[in-house]
């Protein structure tokens, strides 16, 4: 019985919702008809005549004040709507209408009735949204002391945001520290240094950690009863201190490379010792994991130093050896460094081999993967590609493959072509990127623009075909073609990662909400009316009367027809019934 009663109530509620949704026009005409029937007892004609007499007695100054006040109010609403749209990306009036008025009218019933069936799909989409909005470490990030700080000295601008540097500090604490650091004085100092916000304080702490390691401990070893000898024993060097100095204090890449080589000696020794002791307990295992991260980081940065200094083949060899030695550490994305170095060597066959391994459906994509694949496909046809010839004879199979690869890359990250085609100026890439966002596009184009320019006709092919991607995905936030729908969170995250002097690229381009345009038009129209009424009161009065008479002419015509059809004694007959 309870189920039957609840089912009846749900059916009744759905009928009411349906009537509100589709029959509001019928209800509106019924109300008008009822008002017409009750016009005599309600004395509507007398009230209207009283109102018209009151309006006729008003002076033009009243209308000027009225229109001026309306213009002021609509202008304030416009300013508030524009501010809310710039900050939150949506209209305040639309949000209030959807959030509060729509539930009152039953607009969410259809979704709530299917909640139990779609809970799994919602959780999957939420997980996908979280993974797409994850911030990643930039595998091609620059050196703070040798590159970012030099930019600041020259331009006076800060290329890194506080949010970006805070993420780097968290990464350093994750990779370079462990729970047993308090047992070694140098590591304890570095544990505090990674949390320090002031760069000079971090550098001073790194020097302090190295000075502690210079202390020599003496161990007394008795050789004979009458004499003793003192053995000098050096404490192990602190590799993370050298890392910090190489990253932040070194002003050139050559200086950074020297410090990283010293860090490599210290880090390699710590790694070998912890490798032998890793099975003795969880504490030793954590130390070995930390030492592994330190060693991989040092070798990767040494390879990047070699790449910066022009020793590209040496850098490629170091990266290949590192990937073979530590194949499971994919968090550093060393293959992206390798792809960039191989493109510099123009070793396109090796690039294709790396792509065959990492451009897999089960692995996370990146702009480097997608656009490098598109570059290789474009390289095969770009030197002979002509848009006029292609429009006459159609695209060949190779050209079609190249265009599809470009469309795939543009769908993954639609911000990259503007930087590759130099439609937008580049800045220094941040230390962290958001995949499919503007930050990733900057990081990719900063290092790969030269590789696209080196391939003859590649940028021309990109220029002719990249905008065609958007015709395939008219609603990118709702449905994608080859990838998941474009995440909504990219603009907010990119504004946190990129400096304020950079204009963040937004996709899809947001159109102004209807209510902003409406309030802008209303504000302008009422202000114009106020000005005209103040300047030409008599003429505007004549115009207003003519406008109102024209506006109400159809209604008066309908009322006359209704009065001619219905008998004059209808209300009297209805009261008798």
UniProtKB/Swiss-Prot annotation:
CDD domains found in the cross-reference section: ST7
Q: Which domain of life is it from?
A: Eukaryota
* UniProt keyword annotations, A-Z: Glycoprotein, Membrane, Phosphoprotein, Transmembrane, Transmembrane helix
Where found?
Membrane
Sorted alphabetically, which PANTHER family does this protein's record hold? Answer: SUPPRESSION OF TUMORIGENICITY 7 (PTHR12745), SUPPRESSOR OF TUMORIGENICITY 7 PROTEIN (PTHR12745:SF8)
Pfam families assigned to the protein according to its UniProt record, in alphabetical order: ST7 (PF04184)
Instruction: Provide the family line.
Output: Belongs to the ST7 family.
Glycosylation is annotated at 47
GO annotation, cellular component aspect: membrane
Q: Give all Phosphoserine modified positions.
A: 386
User: What parts of the sequence cross the membrane?
Assistant: 15-35, 62-82, 512-532, 539-559
- Output this protein's name: Suppressor of tumorigenicity 7 protein
Give the membrane topology.
Multi-pass membrane protein
């Amino acid at each position: 019985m309870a189920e039957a009663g609840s089912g009846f109530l749900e059916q009744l509620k759905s009928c009411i919702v349906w009537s509100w949704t589709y029959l509001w026009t019928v209800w509106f005409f019924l109300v008008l008809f009822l008002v017409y029937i009750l016009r005599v007892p309600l004395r509507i004609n007398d009230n209207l005549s009283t109102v018209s007499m009151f309006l006729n007695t008003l002076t033009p100054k009243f209308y000027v004040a009225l229109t001026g006040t309306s213009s002021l109010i609509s202008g304030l609403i416009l300013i508030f709507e524009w501010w809310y749209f710039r900050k939150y990306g949506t209209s305040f009036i639309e949000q209030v209408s959807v959030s509060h008025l729509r539930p009152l009218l039953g607009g969410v019933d259809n979704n709530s009735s299917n909640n139990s069936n779609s809970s799994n799909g919602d959780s999957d989409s939420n997980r996908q949204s979280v993974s797409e909005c994850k911030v990643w470490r930039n595998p091609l990030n620059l050196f703070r002391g040798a590159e970012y700080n030099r930019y600041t000295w020259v331009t006076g601008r800060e290329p890194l945001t506080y949010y970006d540097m805070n993420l780097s500090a968290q990464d350093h604490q994750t990779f370079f520290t462990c729970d047993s650091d308090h047992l070694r004085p140098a590591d304890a100092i570095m544990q505090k240094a990674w949390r320090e916000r002031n760069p000079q304080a971090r550098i001073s702490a790194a020097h302090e950690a190295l000075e502690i390691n210079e202390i020599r401990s003496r161990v007394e070893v008795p050789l004979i009863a009458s004499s003793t000898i003192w053995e000098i024993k050096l404490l192990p060097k602190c590799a993370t201190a050298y890392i910090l100095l190489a990253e932040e204090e070194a002003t050139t890449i050559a200086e950074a490379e020297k410090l990283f080589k010293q860090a490599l000696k210290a880090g390699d020794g710590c790694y070998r010792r912890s490798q032998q002791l890793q099975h003795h307990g969880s504490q030793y295992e954590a130390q070995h994991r930390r030492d592994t991260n330190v060693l991989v980081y040092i070798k990767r940065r040494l390879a990047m130093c070699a790449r910066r200094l022009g020793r590209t083949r040496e850098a490629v060899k170091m990266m290949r050896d590192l990937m073979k030695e530590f194949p499971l550490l994919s968090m550093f994305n060393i293959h992206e460094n390798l792809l960039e170095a191989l493109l510099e060597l123009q070793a396109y066959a090796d690039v294709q081999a790396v792509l065959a391994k990492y451009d897999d459906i089960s692995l996370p994509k990146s702009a480097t993967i997608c656009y490098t694949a598109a570059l290789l496909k474009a390289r095969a046809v770009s030197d002979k590609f002509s848009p006029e010839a292609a429009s006459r004879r159609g695209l060949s199979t190779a050209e079609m493959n190249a265009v599809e690869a470009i469309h795939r890359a543009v769908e993954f990250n639609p911000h990259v072509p503007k930087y590759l085609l130099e439609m937008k100026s580049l800045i220094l890439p941040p230390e962290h990127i958001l995949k499919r966002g503007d930050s990733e596009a900057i990081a990719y184009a900063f290092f790969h623009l030269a590789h696209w320019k080196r391939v003859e006709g590649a940028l021309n092919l990109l220029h002719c075909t990249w905008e065609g991607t958007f015709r395939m995905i008219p609603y990118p936030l709702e449905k994608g073609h080859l990838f998941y729908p474009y995440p909504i969170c990219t603009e907010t995250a990119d504004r946190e990662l990129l400096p304020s002097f950079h204009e963040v690229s937004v996709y899809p381009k947001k159109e102004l909400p209807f209510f902003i345009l409406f309030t802008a038009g209303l504000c302008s129209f009422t202000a114009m009316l106020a000005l005209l009424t103040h300047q030409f009161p008599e003429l505007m009065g004549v115009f207003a009367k003519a406008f109102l008479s024209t506006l109400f002419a159809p209604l008066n015509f309908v009322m006359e027809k209704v009065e001619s059809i219905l008998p004059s004694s209808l209300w009297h007959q209805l009261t008798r019934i």
